[in-house]
A protein has these predicted regions:
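Flexible, charged surface loops at secondary-structure boundaries
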Residues: 7-10, 32-35, 63-69, 96-101, ...
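Conserved P-loop NTPase mechanochemical-coupling segment
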Residues: 63-84
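Hydrophobic/aromatic beta-strand patches that form the interior of the parallel beta-sheet core
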Residues: 14-16, 37-41, 53-54, 71, ...
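Walker A/P-loop NTP-binding active-site region of P-loop NTPases
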Residues: 22-59
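Accessory, usually C-terminal, subdomains that scaffold auxiliary metal cofactors
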Residues: 186-197
C-alpha cells in the first residue's frame, strides 16, 4: 500500500507527472484516501469524493468538519476567471493552514493553469507548499509533461513520481535537466510496461519515484535489473500499490 510519509510537520510535497491514461490521476486519487484531510482541486469534473463542491469557500468550510474528510472542488468553470479562482484557492489554503491537523491539497492539471494565465494561483500554491512545514499542509501537483511544472513550484517539492512520458520532447527534457540517460531509460521501461499490460486489462502501473533532495535512499535488490534503480540511489522504479514483480515495492 502507499506509505504515509511525514516530513517535519506535514506530509511530503509531491509531483505526479505522466501523460493521459498513464495512471497519474489514479495514483493521486487513491493515495489521498491514506490521508485524513484532503482537498482535490479538479478542473476536469472527473474526480469523485464523498464531498464535491462548486465554490471554493464551501470547500474551505468543510475542512475539519469531521476527523476524516475528502473533498473535491470542481472549478473548471473558473478557468476563464483567474481572480475568482485565486480567491477560492486562497480560502482553501487559509482554512487548511488554520486547521490543527495535517491537510493535503491536490493541485492537478498544473499545465492548464500555467497555459491559461493563472500565474497568481500557481504562486499562491507555491507559498502554501513552502510554509507547509510550519502549518501542517502539503501540496501535491499533477501535470502531463515534466516541462509543464513551473520552476518555483518544482523548487518546493520533495519528490516527483513519473508514470511515463508522452513524446520525445518529454524525454529530452528529462535527459537535459533532470536525471540524464539512466532516468530516461527507467521512464521508458515504465511506459513500455504500461502499454503492454494495459492491453491485458491492467488498471495499475509502475512509476519512477525520484527524490528532489538527491539523498541515496534506494538500492537494487538481488535480481533487480539495472534500470530499476539509479546508480546514486535517488530514484527507483516502484509498483503503484506496492504489488507485482516489476521493480520493488516501497513503504
Amino acid at each position: 500500500m502507499f506509505p504515509v510519509q511525514r516530513v517535519s510537520g506535514r506530509d511530503v510535497n509531491l509531483a505526479f507527472v505522466g501523460p493521459p491514461k498513464s495512471g497519474k490521476t489514479y495514483a493521486m486519487s487513491e493515495l489521498r484516501f491514506h490521508r485524513a484531510q484532503t482537498v482535490y482541486i479538479d478542473i476536469t469534473g472527473e474526480v469523485v469524493a464523498p464531498f464535491v463542491f462548486g465554490r471554493g469557500r464551501d470547500v474551505a468550510l468543510a475542512i475539519g468538519l469531521r476527523p476524516c474528510v475528502h473533498t473535491v472542488w470542481q472549478c473548471g468553470h473558473l478557468m476563464d476567471n483567474p481572480d475568482v479562482m485565486l480567491a477560492g484557492v486562497k480560502a482553501i489554503g487559509s482554512a487548511a493552514q488554520l486547521y490543527h491537523e495535517r491537510v493535503t491539497i491536490i493541485f492537478d492539471e498544473v499545465g492548464a493553469f500555467k497555459d491559461q494565465g493563472h500565474k497568481k494561483t500557481i504562486d499562491h500554491m507555491c507559498g502554501v507548499a513552502r510554509t507547509g512545514r510550519q502549518k501542517g499542509v502539503s501540496v501535491w501537483a499533477g501535470s502531463h509533461r515534466p516541462q509543464e511544472m513551473p520552476p518555483n513550484l518544482n523548487a518546493v517539492l520533495d519528490e516527483t513520481w513519473y508514470t511515463g512520458c508522452g513524446n520525445a520532447a518529454d524525454y529530452d527534457f528529462l535527459r537535459r535537466y533532470v536525471g540524464k540517460e539512466e532516468l530516461v531509460a527507467a521512464v521508458k521501461q515504465v511506459t513500455r510496461h504500461r502499454a503492454a499490460t494495459k492491453r491485458a486489462g491492467a488498471t495499475e502501473f509502475p512509476f519512477v519515484r525520484r527524490l528532489h533532495s538527491g539523498a541515496a535512499e534506494f538500492s537494487r535488490l538481488p535480481g533487480d535489473p539495472e534500470w530499476t534503480c539509479s546508480p546514486d540511489g535517488n530514484w527507483c522504479v516502484v509498483e503503484q500499490l506496492g504489488t507485482g514483480t516489476l521493480g520493488r515495492p516501497h513503504g
